[in-house]
UniProtKB/Swiss-Prot annotation:
The lineage of its organism: Eukaryota, Fungi, Dikarya, Ascomycota, Pezizomycotina. Dually phosphorylated on Thr-144 and Tyr-146, which activates the enzyme. ATP binds at M1, G2, A3, F4, G5, L6, V7, K22. The modification Phosphotyrosine is found at Y146. One of its GO terms (molecular function) is protein serine kinase activity. GO terms for cellular component: cytoplasm; nucleus. The gene is HOG1. The TXY motif contains the threonine and tyrosine residues whose phosphorylation activates the MAP kinases. It comes from the Eukaryota. This is Mitogen-activated protein kinase HOG1. Its cofactor is Mg(2+).
Length: 329
């Protein structure tokens, strides 16, 4: 079961390949759900990268349920982490692919916002793909409320509830990296207050300039009286990890998002040297068009837009299949 749909495996009778089918039930029941479904479809159409789940078909049933058909990967990182400890080379390779995907996503002007092990799919060849873009948003938005799963939520989301950018995905990736190293979640908060407390136990109290960016008076009243805590060396917690792994993690789990490492910088870190190839870490050809995102439209309008996108997808797909192959003449 996904965030707002049911996912099952099936076989494509034309290609004989296994696929995943995500059923969005009653997508036009509310404007919010209509918009979210439209956003996910637009993103899946736009984002084309080896480390991002790819859309292979989409259709609407007579009852107006929507079906996204994507490639099928055998498992996800959450299942892998709960089944056995990961060996060093797998941790490196998985982190590399996560960051390679994030570099592309961020270059398209997109923030995933809900990166967590269950949204990271893996196949038997250890190929990794990021999925579930239902919560994705434009970079640097004015947003309200909590979005991502608590354990992987960046502190600026908890502290400000207002502005955040691509760095929230780097924090989430850092939490996932730590979980791969340790075999258990790094910050398993019971609620957002407990979550923040666990983070400060390891990373210390947020710097004053970070606290000054807090927009919510309630959050300020909670944070300012807290006792000062010093940042603990991550090497003390991750005693079995390589120094280079700990150093990269230190650069990903930074309270101040402005000082957090970017995806392309993390890819160039010595820890990922066995896989890093700057000529094979592509960025998006163009930014994603977010012009629809602030629209407050009725369900019927979202429905028309959705049907238009689906028709466009099938027309483009048919044109690509009908196009004559180049013979070099």
């Amino acid at each position: 079961m996904g965030a707002f749909g049911l996912v099952c495996s099936a076989k494509d009778q034309l290609t004989n390949q296994a696929v995943a089918v995500k059923k969005i039930m009653k997508p036009f029941s509310t404007p919010v759900l209509s918009k979210r479904t439209y956003r996910e479809l637009k993103l899946l159409k736009h984002l084309r990268h080896e480390n991002i789940i790819s859309l292979s078909d989409i259709f609407i049933s007579p009852l107006e349920d929507i079906y996204f058909v994507t490639e099928l990967l055998g498992t996800d990182l959450h299942r892998l982490l709960t089944s056995r400890p990961l060996e060093k080379q797998f941790i490196q390779y998985f982190l590399y692919q996560i960051l390679r995907g994030l570099k592309y996503i961020h270059s398209a002007g997109v923030v995933h916002r809900d990166l967590k092990p269950s949204n990271i799919l893996v196949n038997e060849n250890c190929d990794l793909k990021i999925c579930d873009f239902g919560l994705a948003r434009i970079q640097d938005p004015q947003v309200t409320g909590y979005v991502s799963t608590r354990y992987y939520r960046a502190p600026e989301i908890m502290l400000t509830w207002q502005k955040y950018d691509v760095e929230v995905d780097i924090w989430s990736a850092g939490c996932i990296f730590a979980e791969m190293l340790e075999g258990k979640p790094l910050f398993p908060g019971k609620d957002h207050v407990n979550q923040f407390s666990i983070i400060t136990e390891l990373l210390g109290t947020p710097p004053d300039d970070v606290i000054q960016t807090i927009c919510s008076e309630n959050t300020l009243r909670f944070v300012q009286p807290l006792p000062k805590r010093e940042r603990q060396p991550l090497a003390n917690k991750f005693k079995n990890a390589e120094p280079e792994a700990v150093d990269l993690l230190e650069n990903m789990l930074v309270f101040d998002p402005r000082k957090r490492v970017r995806a392309e910088q993390a890819l160039a870190h010595p820890y990922l040297a066995p896989y890093h190839d700057p000529t094979d870490e592509p960025i998006a050809e163009e930014k994603f068009d977010w012009s629809f995102n602030d629209a407050d439209l009725p369900v019927d309008t979202w429905k028309i837009m959705m049907y238009s996108e689906i028709l466009d997808y099938h027309n483009v797909d048919a044109a690509a299949q009908d196009a004559p192959e180049s013979n070099g003449s």
